[in-house]
Design a protein with these regions (language model features):
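Short hydrophobic alpha-helical segments enriched in small aliphatic residues
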Residues: 5-7, 13
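Core AdoMet radical
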Residues: 83-103, 107, 111-130, 145-158, ...
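Conserved C-terminal portion of the radical SAM core fold
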Residues: 199-250
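N-terminal [4Fe-4S]-dependent radical SAM core
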Residues: 33-76, 81-117
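Acidic (Asp/Glu)-rich catalytic clusters
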Residues: 107-111, 136-144, 166-174, 206-210
Length: 250
């Protein structure tokens, strides 16, 4: 199906769709200046929405996950190690404002006029009381130069009241919700201790997109036990979902 879905990595796209594609083979109608590419780059997605450079600033707001605290399991996902992708300044003893200050200080050296998106990245960033969540989001939005939020979360941790908040916020700020799907196969989700089903993933994506919110999905390629055909089948499944962006990990 023809969807305006943006992806993060050419290498991952080539691997994922080596023998098939979930999009039309002719992308010229979507991207006339990029005829050699069969996907939209994430950078282009941002360029089309901002008239200036924007940079994500990662934040560790001190959240946990339901498969870490006993609500759905213990220990978290089998592969989880947030330290592998968290910047040095992301420490929970620092406030949201302090983490933004350090991130902005780093990037503003090269691009003084840069604007920013607060990226709530570590663990499940919608897994707390609604008032506590909104307070942290609003703290980030109040920081000078921050023009929106990107919130990483699980598909089983998006209450309707929070979706309503994001829907209202998206009318005046950039808002994207990124869901960790990781796999479209329930047997794999059990194996890696995710604690949710693919049906829950599809439901969360459709509910979020239906409210007009930019909706992203994360997928891991090469999880234990998945065959090549099963990995390629992820493309067929995801192409039927109303996602805005897709990030592929391996």
């Amino acid at each position: 199906s023809r969807q305006n879905t943006y992806v993060f990595s050419e290498k991952h796209v080539r691997l994922f769709w080596k023998t098939r594609t979930c999009f039309s083979k002719d992308f010229s109608y979507l991207c006339p200046m990029e005829k050699t590419k069969r996907y939209y780059e994430y950078g282009k997605f941002l360029q089309e929405r901002f008239d200036h450079k924007v940079q994500k600033i990662s934040i560790n707001a001190g959240f946990t996950c339901p498969n870490r605290d006993g609500a759905k399991g213990w220990g978290g996902c089998t592969y989880c190690n947030n330290q592998t992708f968290s910047p040095e300044y992301c420490h929970t003893e620092k406030s949201v404002t302090e983490q933004l200050e350090e991130g902005v200080r780093f990037f503003s050296r090269k691009y003084p006029d840069m604007r920013y998106l607060a990226y709530f990245q570590a663990y499940t960033n919608t897994y707390d009381r609604l008032d506590s969540l909104i307070r942290k989001y609003e703290e980030a939005l109040a920081y000078p130069g921050v023009e929106g939020l990107i919130v990483g979360t699980r598909p089983d941790c998006m209450p309707e009241g929070l979706l309503d908040y994001f829907a209202e916020l998206s009318q005046r700020k950039f808002v994207m919700i990124e869901y960790g799907l990781e796999s479209t196969l329930d047997k794999t989700l059990v194996r890696i201790n995710r604690g949710h089903t693919h049906e829950e993933s599809e439901s969360a994506i459709r509910r979020t997109a239906a409210k007009g919110i930019y909706t992203g999905a994360h997928l891991i390629l090469g999880l234990p036990g998945e065959s090549r055909d099963e990995i390629l089948h992820h493309a067929d499944v995801l192409s039927r979902l109303p996602i805005t962006t897709l990030k592929l990990h391996q």
